[in-house]
Amino acid sequence: MLQARIRVTLKSGILDPQGVTVAHAMDSLGFRHPDNCRMGKYIELSYPEDSEPASLHEELRKVCERLLVNPNTETYSLSLVRIAADGTETVLEGSGR
């Protein structure tokens, strides 16, 4: 199986109100207050083993840029991983913006 792993985060300098809320909640609950807390999205998409990695990666890059990511406020990283039957993982492609 091929698995796409996409991580979407706010660009540095963009206010992250959800991250601020989590940091304050941690403090209120008695946990150590972090210096910084940034929230984001994590997406996994699975494809058949016989998918061609280079064309799949290019298609997924377009999915990120046209559907999943707001280029004004967010950035992303994209990894394409082959997962063998025994669970062994091999990173095939990686990129981001």
Model region roles, listed by residue range:
Residues 1-97:
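Non-catalytic terminal accessory/regulatory regions of metabolic enzymes
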